Amino acid sequence: MPGRRRQKRTEASKIDATPPWETRARAEPDVTTGPYDERDAPDDELERIDLGALRIPIDGGFDVQVEVNEVQQVIAATLAGPHGTVQLGVFAAPRNEGIWNEVRAEIAESLRGQRRPVPSEKEGPFGTELHGTIPDDTGRGTVPVRFVGVDGPRWFLRALFAGPVATDDTAAEPFEQALRGVVVVRGTEPLPVREPVPLQLPTGVELPNPGS
């Protein structure tokens, strides 16, 4: 089912538990199509940049940028191309319960409170999405946005498409393909629900000194 990454492992467990004397037909498990939990990641040849909790394909013709908070922790990654950006963030979530429905409702409420066109829900390749607008860099105009959410085991991945990639299927396609190839490495550290899962810079890369 789109938007949920546990299907393959759960269904496989059910099949393995079927007694051998039962002869009823058994359906094949659904195949996870990505984004992937690290346990279900495919053995493919995609080159990925390793940001710790996120491993992102880098052959889509876009730049991968990182965003940091006030204490210089990497909290999000942005795929930037000529037709817009896609910001990726991974957050802690319950083990057996998705939070995208709740998060989506809260984002919609926030957008409605900004006196802009009412955001709308649409079905997309990753499940139910939220479409709306946010202020542009000048503060005088708006930018179309598209929020995508994927629930995984103890993690939630949010992708924010901004610019033409939010409304143009052709412009969005390479970004969607990259999103399908993302691997989430949640780790075992206990974190409050919705807390950003810390990312890290690739080996050998350092942030510039903010005082320089």
Regions found by a protein language model. Give the residues of each.
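Hydrophobic/aromatic beta-strand elements that line small-molecule binding cavities or substrate pockets
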Residues: P144-G149
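Conserved polar/disulfide-associated segments of primarily extracytoplasmic proteins
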Residues: G3-R4, E22, R26-L51, P57-V143, ...
